Amino acid sequence: MKNINVYYIIKSKISLKRVTAVRKYDITALGEILIDFVPDGVDSVGDMRFIRKAGGAPLNVLATAARAGLKTAFIGKVGNDLPGEFLIETVKGCGIDCNYLKKDNEHNTTLAFVELDNKGDRKFSFYRTYGADRFIYESDVDKKLIADSKVFHFGSLSLTDEPSYFSTEIAVKTAKDCGCTVTYDPNYRPPLWDSPEKAAERMAVLLPYVDIIKLSVEELEMISEGRGTEFLFEKGVRLALVTDGDKGATLCFKGEKAHIPAIKAKTVDTTGAGDIFLGTFVSEFIKKGENLDELSLDDAINFTQKAVFISGKSTEKYGAIASISDVII
């Protein structure tokens, strides 16, 4: 691949022209939805306080797209409990269709506690052994909804266990058969896997059905066993976005590589930044009204530039959904 040096450019005008499409939904996503308990200082006796935030990578991607004016839908599960009610109301508030987000009477809503270091980087502790998002069955996957969507998105947390693993596989294959653009974010979370080896194996299984992938430098190293993006393209991926924290991101497309440096941000919390990055890129791709065959390298670079900017700005606020900048509109 050739390397192209690209510098961040803010365009004064970005076309928001919508293209009339036969399909009802712009993006449908399947996967985890959970409560993130994020630090909120300490109380009067010095104990750490936490506040609840809606979380889950697929949800963050959809929230970003919905903020950009796109029509979105979410396939997933929450418990029939107070955290689940909070998440449903949050999804509705984001403008995401939640008719396919189901309540599970047998399992609780998944919870995660987040710790932030002085750079805003995170550590997670999950309460998910009986989390509802692990119990997505094939019957929960609405194939007509997927067929009525331009883009289908999924992540790797629904691949950790059955029955969600099988259901995700069914959904992805349905999307591919229906001509959806399939997007994927491996989003590796070590506490949720038995071993890095099992994670790498499972996260690579559905690559032949993926059109666009977003992953970190570390995730790429793990999945490809050091072979890099060539491994992804050999599997059938067509466009790769490789993020590298405060170093920026690299677009790999049509035999070329373009690196976009990160913006200078006053980072306090990186939660959801990668999801917002991908949500921005995919939103721009959809609004352009092209498919990957027609997408030019220049347009892909422009989308990546905007994604780097929006995701960088999001790290200046706490929480994922709350930090999605109005700039995306």
Where does each model-flagged region fall?
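Conserved phosphate-binding/catalytic region of the ribokinase-like
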Residues: 2-10, 15-26, 173, 226-329
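Glycine-rich phosphate/adenosyl-contacting loop at the front of the ribokinase-like
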Residues: 7-97
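Conserved N-terminal subdomain of the carbohydrate kinase-like
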Residues: 71-154
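Short, conserved phosphate/pyrophosphate- and ester-handling motifs at nucleotide-, phospho-/glycolipid
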Residues: 65, 216, 274
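Conserved beta-alpha-beta core of the PfkB/ribokinase-like small-molecule kinase fold
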Residues: 159-231, 247-248
